[in-house]
Amino acid sequence: MDCIQCKRTFLNEDIVASISGSIMGDEHTDSYYYCSTCNVYTVVSWWDNFTGVETMEISGPISKEKGDKRIEIIRQCSQPWDKKCRCDAQRRYFNDTLD
């Protein structure tokens, strides 16, 4: 994975946070990569729909300030990898669109 702005290849330690949720039967996962060179985030979003087809989208750059706020929400969830989690942080992150 590369920084969307400077194209630097990310290392494993550049993955700052990930969260998964189930929306209309599809699993949606966002992973945040931080580029210390650019001071921005690149977000990689995966959709695994109920038929088993997976798609990926890369978005950004996201400012450090905005990305930090999103990551703060993710870190309030004790199980961000669990697409079935319905804690306040999960609901807030996914704008109350979870199954």
Regions found by a protein language model. Name each.
Residues 1-28, 32, 44-50, 59-68:
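Short recognition patches in nucleic-acid-associated and regulatory proteins
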Residues 2, 31-34, 73, 81-83:
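Secretory pathway export signals and precursors
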Residues 7, 36-39:
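Cys/His-coordinated zinc-binding microdomains
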Residues 30-32, 39, 91:
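Intrinsically disordered, low-complexity segments enriched in small/polar residues
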Residues 47-99:
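Short, intrinsically disordered terminal segments enriched in charged and Pro/Gly residues
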